Amino acid sequence: MTYFLNSDFSKLPLCESIIEVSRAIRQDFPSKRVIEDLKHKVEVARNYVVSENLPFLKLRKLIKLFYKNWKFECASGIYKLSDVLWLDHVLKTHKGTAVSLGIIILHIAQQLNLPLMPVIFPTQLILRADNGNGNMWLINPFNGDTLNKHVLKVWLKGNISPTAELYNNYLNKVQYFEVVRKMLDILKSALMEERNLELALNVSNVLLKIDPKNPYEIRDRGLIYSQLECDHVALTDLIYFVEHCPDDPISEILKIQIHSMEKKVITLH
């Protein structure tokens, strides 16, 4: 993970950041192939949109190229969530999630200087383009469809709460750095669910390099260590969380787990 530690990836272009963290997590991540594939797609896209003069019209052509011509789409059927998050798999299959598809098209738009930015909506990543005249174009990265406020309200009520409201700040643009964190959070959860604990631990360690004192990240690392039966290390992380977040409801559950683990460690000694 040395190269990751030496990189201030928050200042890197989006896909370069994702490639850096992917290399830190997966030893077999094919960085060279991914970089070459992305460069090729940028050049094809550049030639495809060149006939348009206005950035907004270029962006519309890019959306058409990405979803209609290249046929990038949301994954369906039976699949592992982690497979539709890794950029190498998504570039190979053209099937991904909102965040992985969004990352690729954001990268291409960034390289072409097109006005596309990420929005971390409560239900998923969405894309936003401003035309400079006060008009905002919201795009679903799953399929390139235009989103309106009615659809967003339905998403909130269906996924968050029947009483959820749509607030303006839900549509605020975020920095690419936040997209990297979002992807890592989803990837960590997916790997834990798939019982790929060694890779999940690598993701957790990357997140802790970004935010070393985040008690929730430390808690998750402790839970992974406990599943790997590394109780000694797990105890340190879980106790840290309980001490720093005593009012969190999960702390009471963790106290029981900590007590059980402490008895086990004492017995082994």
From Swiss-Prot:
Coiled coil: none annotated. It comes from the Bacteria. InterPro entries: SirB1_N, TPR-like_helical_dom_sf. NCBIfam families: PRK10941.1 (NF008188). Belongs to the UPF0162 family. This is UPF0162 protein bbp_163. It comes from Buchnera aphidicola subsp. Baizongia pistaciae (strain Bp).
